[in-house]
């Protein structure tokens, strides 16, 4: 191809590209020199010159204006208004603080003050015949956490040959129930669930005398001291000893054991148990040492009238004074072994709302009965987890008697237990509030729990086998505490009353209760 031809081709390519540089909307007569995308704007010089340029006042001009009488008066007025407003707010805050009611100082509370304790006296009966002791218990910690219990009283589970003091080792786990490693693993797992482990160290639990024979007291005392120190080092949160009424010099030994636990940590608990229901004997044991928790058979007396229940509770509180109480119907055993079935729901409500620590045995949340089923051990029935729990007999187990069945029933005894345990652990009036019994109709036991400016709780228990309408009186309340005309329902032990839903407002002038029904009502603090 010639040189001229090459030049012509280049010109063609340039001519083809040139239209791309033209404006898309250019008119036919547009100047050829304009470029695509470039817009030139010509601003008239006279229009720019017409604009006013503001440069502000000079320093001298500002000082002159600011010093004028008008601006001086304005500044002083604004300054005076600011300080008057500030002083007014300060005075208002002082008045509010002075006139506001003083808050009561919260008492020091340990973990056992904040909820219920749950006893598992027979570990194998609790986990079932096919599970293995301590390892089986670990699998049920999730269930125990749903009960909102603060402590688990376990055992005894130590090595004990019946009536043989030298063959009893309080520092070793019974091999039939597990190993030391199993127990340490249980402690760690329970800690993650915020459940404290209390170990029952009643020495001769398989024998006739829980404390062996009187001449062997010194041997037992030495073993106890060694065991307490050893288990505390392993992380146990407390100890229980039962039948202290059968222990010679019980007051001396209890004081010594309490010192060992408290010297290790103030957050360690010692529980004593007695089969006695005599109030004076109970007080004598309590006076042996401070901060001792005592379970007894005091409430196992026939208290199946409201008047008798009120008398027993008030006598106990007066006798124990400012001591922290615990409430149970026995040192061991099920509620159903002491309380007729129709009173079980009432007693749950009673124990959870009295001032002190409620103590229950495994199965109390279900209404488990010691002799209800063929094949059940009389003193330690198997925990009924499901219909097949009682595998040692062919007799069927009713679903509504099991954990599985009651879990699914909003009106079950288990549901009531969980609700009460939850309230007991988070409401200040129930945690550490004052207790005042009320004047009420015959057959009723009613009382108020209150703390400072927190929500108040009214408990009304009908121990009669007939329904009644009652007026709850406030004549026994101290100054500054009064009852409203109505209160809101939190819980009724009668799950058949569908018309009484939580939050229903009930008149205290004419309060209707069914036979054996208990009510937990709530009303606010009013200054």
Curated annotation (Swiss-Prot):
Biased composition range(s): Basic and acidic residues: 7-21
UniProt entry keywords in alphabetical sequence: Amino-acid transport, Cell junction, Cell membrane, Disulfide bond, Glycoprotein, Isopeptide bond, Lysosome, Membrane, Phosphoprotein, Signal-anchor, Transmembrane, Transmembrane helix, Transport, Ubl conjugation
Glycosylation sites noted in the Swiss-Prot or TrEMBL record: 166, 249, 259, 263, 318, 386, 400, 510
Tissue: In brain expressed on capillary endothelia in cerebral cortex (at protein level). Highest expression in kidney, jejunum, ileum, colon, placenta, testis and spleen. Lower levels found in liver, lung and brain with weakest expression in heart. Expressed in retina, inner blood-retinal barrier of retina, retinal vascular endothelial cells. Also expressed in C6 glioma cells and in the retinal capillary endothelial cell line TR-iBRB2.
Chain segments annotated as transmembrane: 76-98
Primary residence: membrane
SMART domains, per database record: Aamy
Single annotated GO MF: L-leucine transmembrane transporter activity
Cytoplasmic-side segments: 1-75
GO biological process entries: carbohydrate metabolic process; cellular response to glucose starvation; isoleucine transport; L-alanine import across plasma membrane; L-histidine transport; L-leucine import across plasma membrane; L-leucine transport; methionine transport
Taxonomic superkingdom: Eukaryota
Post-translational events: Phosphorylation on Ser-300 and on Ser-421 by ecto-protein kinases favors heterotypic cell-cell interactions. N-glycosylated; N-glycosylation is crucial for trafficking and stability of SLC3A2 to the plasma membrane.
Spans within the Extracellular topological domain: 99-527
Region annotation (Disordered) ranges: 1-31
One cellular component term from this protein's GO annotations in UniProt: basal plasma membrane
Induction or repression: Expression induced in normal hepatic cells in the presence of actinomycin-D.
Post-translational modification Phosphothreonine, affected residues: 5
Residue numbers carrying Phosphoserine: 2, 58, 300, 421
Protein's UniProt keywords contain Glycosyltransferase: no
PANTHER family linked to this entry: 4F2 CELL-SURFACE ANTIGEN HEAVY CHAIN (PTHR46673:SF1)
Subunit structure of this chain's protein: Disulfide-linked heterodimer with a non-glycosylated light chain (SLC7A5, SLC7A6, SLC7A7, SLC7A8, SLC7A10 or SLC7A11). Interacts with TLCD3A/CT120 and ICAM1. Constitutively and specifically associates with beta-1 integrins (alpha-2/beta-1, alpha-3/beta-1, alpha-5/beta-1 and alpha-6/beta-1), but minimally with alpha-4/beta-1. Interacts with LAPTM4B; recruits SLC3A2 and SLC7A5 to lysosomes to promote leucine uptake into these organelles and is required for mTORC1 activation.
Family: Belongs to the SLC3A transporter family.
Record function comment: Acts as a chaperone that facilitates biogenesis and trafficking of functional transporters heterodimers to the plasma membrane. Forms heterodimer with SLC7 family transporters (SLC7A5, SLC7A6, SLC7A7, SLC7A8, SLC7A10 and SLC7A11), a group of amino-acid antiporters. Heterodimers function as amino acids exchangers, the specificity of the substrate depending on the SLC7A subunit. Heterodimers formed by SLC3A2/SLC7A6 or SLC3A2/SLC7A7 mediate the uptake of dibasic amino acids.
Protein name: Amino acid transporter heavy chain SLC3A2
Species this protein is from: Rattus norvegicus
